[in-house]
Amino acid sequence: MNPATLSTQTSQGMAATPNGTGSEEALRQLEAIEPPEDLLDPQMSENALKVLERRYLKKDPETGKVVETPRQLFWRVASNIARPELSYPDGSADRALAVAREFYDLMARRRFMPNSPTLMNAGREMGMLSACFVLPVEDSIEGIFDSIKATALIQKAGGGTGFSFSRLRPQGDIVRSSGGTTEGPLSFIQVFSKATDAIQQGAFRRGANMGILRGDHPDVIQFITFTADLGRLQNYNISVTGTNKFIDELRSEPSKAHTVLNPRTKEWVPLEKRDAEGNATGEHWTVGEVWDLVVQHAWRTGEPGVVFIDRVNERNPIKNVGLIEATNPCGEQPLHPYDSCNLGSVNLGILVKPGPGGEPVFDWDEYKQIIHTTTRFLDNVIEANRYPLPQIDNMSKTTRRIGLGVMGFADALFK
C-alpha cells in the first residue's frame, strides 16, 4: 500500500482511490473542509483555544490571521488520517467516513490528541506527521553534513531528531585525507546545534534534539561535563550509554580503570585523566569516578541522562533490522537510523465519571475502545505521512513504530 499511488485528489491535498465502491456522498464529506453537521463542536477550554490559535489553526500566509476553526482543524486531521482506509482490501468511502467520524469524535471530546506535527500538517502542503526521528552520524564530512541537511528538513516540518555521535573519532585523532587531526564529536554536536537554532519548527516551535555518546567513547568525560555551561546546547538533551559491561564493573569493581574504545582503530585503552590544558596526568579514570561524574552533573544541570543501550537492544522486538544506537529527543522512543515514530496521548482524567452511587469510577470499557481506535489512528498516520527522505519512508513503513501514551493521570487521581 502506497498513498502516493492513489488517484482521487482532495481539496485538502491527499489522494486516494477506494478499493470498494462506497458512495459519492461519503467521498464528498471526506473531502469537505467542514465536518458533517451532526458531529458535535469541540469541547475546548479558553486556554486550549488560545493554544490552538497560536500554534495549530491555519493562518493566512499574508496577514497571519486565523482562517480555520477548531471544528475544521479536527475534521482536517480526522478525514486525512482516515483516508488510508480507502486503500485497504475492504476499503470503501463509507467505511473511511465512519472511521473519520470516530477520529474526530475522540479529539473533539478530548479523549485523545495526536502529536503536534499531525495537528499542524495533516491535510496541508507540508504533510509531515511524525514527531520523532533518529538519524545516523557517520564518521566522515559527507555523512555528518548529510545528517545536518536531513535534520533541517525534519525540523522545518515540526519533527524532533536524535543522534548517536559515537561513531565519530575522538578529539586529536588523525584524519588521513588531510593529514590533520579532528576536533571530535563535541565540535560537531555544536554544528548540529547551530543548525537547529536557525530553524524554527514549522513556524511554530524551536527544534529539539537528543545527542548520545557511548560511555566507552574516548571523549566521554568532555561530553559529560559539556553542559556545565548552561548556555551551551539549549536545544539538546544529552545522554551517555550505560552498557552491561560498565554496569557490571560498577557493581563489582568500581575502582577498576575505565576502558574506552577508539571507533576508528577499534582499540581498547584505559581512559587517561588530563589537566586543564589537556595534558595527560599519568592517572586513569576509574569506573566509579566516571559514574560519580555523571551523577554530579545530572544533579547540577539535569544532564546527562543515561540510556541503557544493551538492554534496549536486548528487548528490541525487531533485531533483524539492526542495532539501535539512539532515541528521540525525549528518550521514550529508541529508534533505528532513519526511523520515525508518531505519537498520541489518551486523556485519563476525562474517563473518571460518576458511578451508580455518585462515587467516581474509571470507565474501563471506554478506555479499551479508545485504545483500539487510537492505535488504528496512529497506524494510519504511517501511511498518510509525507516523509522528508526516502530512507525514512522505507524504514518507517518497515518498522511501523507508534507511541500511544497517556495524559491527565494526576487529574484522574484527583477526581
Where are these regions (language model features)?
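Extended catalytic cores of very large enzyme megasubunits
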Residues: 1-415
